[in-house]
Amino acid sequence: MNDKDLEIEYLKKIDLFQRHNKHYYDKNKPIVSDQEFDLLKKDIIDLERKYKFLKSEYSPTKSIGFKPSKNFQKIKHKVPMLSLGNAFNEEDLKNFEKKIINFLSLKDVNTIEYSAEPKIDGISASLIYIDGKLTKGLSRGDGNEGEDITQNLKTIKDIPLEITKSNFPKEIDIRGEVFIENNDFKKIKDKFANPRNAASGSLRQKNSLITAKIPLKFIAYTYGYEKKMNIKNQTSFLENLKLWGFKTNPFNKKIIGVKNLMLNHKELEEKRKELAFDIDGIVYKVNDFDLQKRLGFAANAPRWAIAHKFSANSSISEIMNIEIQIGRTGALTPVAKIKPVNIGGVIVSNATLHNEDEIVRKDIRVGDTVTVERAGDVIPHVVSVDLKKRKQNSKKFIFPLKCPSCGSKTIKDYNETTKRQDAVRRCASEGFECEKIAIERIKHFVSKDAFNIDGFGKKIVENFWNLKLVRLPQDIFKLNYNKIEELEGWGKLSVANLRFSIEEKKNISLERFIYSLGIRHIGQENAKLIARHLKTASNFFRLSGEKNIESLSNIDGIGITQIQSIKKFFLNKTNLKVLSELEKNLLIKDVILINNNGLLKNKTFMLTGKLNGISRAEAKSLIEQNSGKIISNVNKKLDYLIAGDKPTLKKINTAKEWNIKIINQTEWLKMLNKSG
């Protein structure tokens, strides 16, 4: 084996080690036995000793040397710690601002002020203060619940333990980033892979004395909830944070206009290497807190903030092979297996090619020399092909016309919206009859946003599938734990933990349950809309009739595409069998509206025409916040038709025929105790 082949073999082992390391240390969910993990480390160390030119900062000789505790108590965040949407260019920012303008129905774009704050590449934390005292400190966790790491956070000098300022809120959840400055990291780099890993590992130590030895810093930047805080905007809040004893980012700015946001982004990107800490972009927040409240949240991110990432990292590599991956909805995704390369501190050996059309457009072939790009959390992808280096015997890649998993034909759906064929080719099966789809649907079923079964990750799903322990979702709730206990890497304690995690998740909300089924076009937001409409699990299980499914078209946001997908789902006999079994094994909670005593409780509304000073999206949001219900068709279930300027006459006439009350904007706002 020559030096180049040795290096490739070594980097593959490093890549595998990093993936296992993440599950072992960061997630506390090992996917291989301790023996296999130790053997892999030994292989890498032996290679380094024998061949001195083999080096990597991700080697086990340089990475974290202790295992964090599994004993941190999990606590639910009062207000979820949501992730942000990403922007990568000026067009993305323009779209972000356009959505804000449309939602708020603003006429002057220059009225929107932004707080621009550098995005530190660290670990998010939540600090709960009651009567000025730090009572609890939580990690972000999965966004809905975090771990109680109070004692470790108290070791950070930047975090005040008690605040006596008169204007400090009676109760507040201060949020910020824990990180290590680059110069401090140089002193401890032999123990950790990178500054972020150092911060993460240190915060999850059972012994806070170990955490205290690490030079952690904390910068505050927002709040989750508060009581009795009289502050009107984000920039004033940041100023008050400093008065209360917190450190804030010295590069925070107040900016108006996308062009100025872009100038600030360019300026900071040029300076980033000179900064004391790592940043990977800038977060823009609508400055005015009242506007933030009006904008609210989408499914899993605020509408009033976005993270503008810095330029992607890229590297040159060679495509060794092109493989087809099959997703839970049957989508066939081509993936380039490339020679492992380091891109922005991460070893990359796979890059997505997106779809068949993309391969044809770029004429991507096995053996090609390509530029691979990785930006933030985005999956690495092939940007371009160096045609000058193309091998003479290269052949065009032929996309499979049959599913590589089950042999069914592959199809491209006709898109009713674009009036064109989809770019994505799919397995015609789309059900549990296709092995790869079945595995991916089960992975989706147990995923974070669905059942969120702790310790039941993707590798466990694959292992249990190969052992024929799981074939359908209901099998998860009927596992043979005695058999699992005999498997390599499992023992009484790990099996008991898995059993507890599964039993704990038998109680689930209706929206999570609907989302877990992996119905095409039914994401989190649509699952929530359907759950709110149906209210009970029994109503969902009774959807199998075509007429019942058609009734979902009354939900604002559910269209023909979603209705067709739901019909297709309920026509599949295996899906019906899965639903029947899950109904027996689960306790699915009815939907209880947060504001169940709202001013519009049990009332249904429909909008027609243009409203004055408020967008249709915000009007719908206000109705739902006050326990009202939006429907999209005029029918006998409609209580009020809200008519703005230039309403649709057909809707007005139909409402009159059925004696439905027609009200104007002023009358509707009075119902909300608001002045028009």
UniProtKB/Swiss-Prot annotation:
SUPFAM superfamilies on file: BRCT domain, DNA ligase/mRNA capping enzyme, catalytic domain, Nucleic acid-binding proteins, RuvA domain 2-like
InterPro entries: BRCT_dom (IPR001357), BRCT_dom_sf (IPR036420), DisA/LigA_HHH (IPR041663), DNA_ligase (IPR001679), DNA_ligase_AS (IPR018239), DNAligase_adenylation (IPR013839), DNAligase_N (IPR013840), NA-bd_OB-fold (IPR012340)
Domain BRCT: 595-676
Domain of life: Bacteria
Enzyme class of the recorded protein, top EC level: ligase
Residues binding NAD(+), per UniProt: D34, Q35, E36, F37, D38, S83, L84, E117, R140, E177, K285, K309
Positions annotated to bind Zn(2+): C403, C406, C427, C434
GO molecular function annotations of the record: DNA ligase (NAD+) activity; metal ion binding
Keywords from the UniProt entry: DNA damage, DNA repair, DNA replication, Ligase, Magnesium, Manganese, Metal-binding, NAD, Zinc
Catalytic activity: NAD(+) + (deoxyribonucleotide)n-3'-hydroxyl + 5'-phospho-(deoxyribonucleotide)m = (deoxyribonucleotide)n+m + AMP + beta-nicotinamide D-nucleotide
EC number: 6.5.1.2
A Pfam cross-reference name: DNA_ligase_OB
Active site, UniProt feature: K119
HAMAP family: DNA_ligase_A (MF_01588)
NCBIfam families per record: dnlj (TIGR00575), PRK07956.1 (NF005932)
Functional note: DNA ligase that catalyzes the formation of phosphodiester linkages between 5'-phosphoryl and 3'-hydroxyl groups in double-stranded DNA using NAD as a coenzyme and as the energy source for the reaction. It is essential for DNA replication and repair of damaged DNA.
Record's protein name: DNA ligase
UniProt organism field: Pelagibacter ubique (strain HTCC1062)
Encoding gene per record: ligA
